[in-house]
């Protein structure tokens, strides 16, 4: 009787796993509750693994069911828990003095010349708002300097902020385009979505050590902080390893957020009264965000399909690996962390821990040589992601 019950549980779990994976392929605009089904995928995978262990101790023939299921869905496992041996890629260590006797130690890739290193980060407008900034601008200065001194060939930044002429209040602290671009030998492409009264610019940016020969912006309806941009970069012959220059296309994107305030989330989880008060609004924002991101990723993929050059993509998806957004990108491109990473690779530094919503993807022409999350950088609610690529 016990075995019969366990066998039924096994079949139900396998059906759950298949349904959860199927939910990832349905856009929220068709039936938005599928988002919740997709989010249960890692739980279904974990239960399948436990059942495999259970049956291996009792009946190896039955154990074949969950074992084969795990083998067939192994790419799904790697999405949330990458299991790869460390790649022997050269690294370099940089120390940044922070003041007060503190030193920030960061390890970057030091790849050979025939590769491309890309660092992406949601920089949270470099903490310019009063509720984010320090009295001495320590986090703003530190973050801009860290990015400027990173050895990455390409920087893809979301929630970017720049004061081109400085300001009376802030001086030259937020002259970020100058610091990240010309001052460090990088070409710049800033996609500005808003210019305020003092001439400060909000938007997204791509900085490149390679010449930018073409560029474009992909709005999702009205141009806002949530949009995509692309740039064609020409690598000189000395950097290609092929004796001739080549061109690559880099996409930088920031998809629709949930727009859920931390205070609302905290209140909803504190008591039943708070849940009743905040849940409807949070649920509505969750639904609207999922629907918007589904349409946005379809727009970006259509642009990627028209690219005549090998593609690299980086950005803040605002969606976890078990979602329609990620699934559509993973169908066409290889995810850097899932390909070579080790562990869950969490990138979100906010009130909801355990999320990997900042991603890098590469087209099939690329070999992913390494990927790391810079968790030592806590000046934003997102940790920077760095990866190295080489054309096959």
State the predicted function of each range:
Residues 239, 244-247, 251, 272, ...:
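His/acidic metal-ligating clusters that form di-metal
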Residues 35, 120-140, 162-168, 259-289:
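Acidic/histidine-rich helix-loop elements
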Residues 70-115, 125, 144, 154-263, ...:
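Structured beta-strand-rich core segments of catalytic domains in phosphoester-bond hydrolases
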Residues 151, 209-211, 308, 365:
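Residue-level detector of structured alpha->beta connecting loops
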Residues 45-88:
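Transmembrane alpha-helices and immediately adjacent membrane-cytoplasm interface residues
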């Amino acid at each position: 009787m016990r075995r019969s019950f366990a066998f039924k549980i096994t079949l139900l779990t396998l059906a759950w796993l298949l349904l959860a994976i199927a939910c990832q392929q349905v856009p929220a605009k068709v039936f938005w509750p599928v988002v919740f089904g997709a989010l249960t995928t890692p739980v279904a995978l974990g239960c399948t693994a436990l059942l495999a262990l259970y049956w291996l101790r009792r009946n190896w023939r039955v154990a074949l069911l969950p074992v084969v299921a795990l083998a067939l869905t192994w790419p799904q496992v790697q999405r949330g828990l990458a299991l790869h041996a460390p790649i022997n890629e050269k690294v370099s260590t940089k120390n940044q003095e922070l003041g007060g006797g503190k030193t920030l130690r960061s390890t970057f890739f030091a790849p050979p010349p025939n590769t491309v290193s890309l660092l992406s980060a949601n920089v949270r407008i470099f903490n310019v708002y009063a509720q984010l900034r320090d009295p001495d601008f320590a986090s703003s200065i530190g973050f801009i300097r860290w990015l400027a001194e990173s050895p990455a060939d390409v920087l893809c930044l979301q929630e970017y902020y720049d004061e081109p002429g400085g300001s009376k209040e802030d001086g030259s602290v937020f002259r970020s385009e100058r610091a990240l671009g010309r001052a460090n030998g990088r070409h710049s492409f800033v996609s500005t979505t808003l210019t305020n009264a003092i001439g400060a610019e909000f938007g997204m940016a791509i900085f490149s050590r390679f010449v930018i020969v073409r560029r474009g912006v992909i709005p999702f309806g009205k141009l806002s902080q949530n949009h995509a941009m692309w740039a064609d970069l020409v690598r000189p012959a000395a950097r290609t390893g092929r004796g001739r220059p080549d061109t690559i296309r880099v996409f930088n994107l920031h998809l629709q957020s949930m727009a859920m305030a931390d205070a609302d989330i905290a209140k909803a989880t504190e008591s039943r009264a708070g849940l009743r008060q905040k849940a409807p609004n949070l649920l509505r924002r969750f639904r609207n965000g999922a629907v918007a991101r589904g349409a946005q990723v379809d727009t970006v993929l259509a642009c990627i399909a028209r690219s005549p050059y090998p593609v690299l993509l980086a950005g803040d998806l605002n969606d976890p690996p078990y979602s329609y957004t990620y699934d559509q990108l993973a169908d066409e491109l290889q995810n850097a962390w899932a390909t070579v990473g080790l562990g869950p690779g969490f990138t979100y530094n906010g009130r909801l821990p355990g999320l990997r919503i900042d991603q890098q993807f590469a087209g099939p022409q690329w070999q992913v040589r390494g990927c790391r999350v810079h968790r030592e950088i806590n000046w934003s609610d997102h940790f920077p992601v760095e990866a190295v690529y080489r054309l096959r």
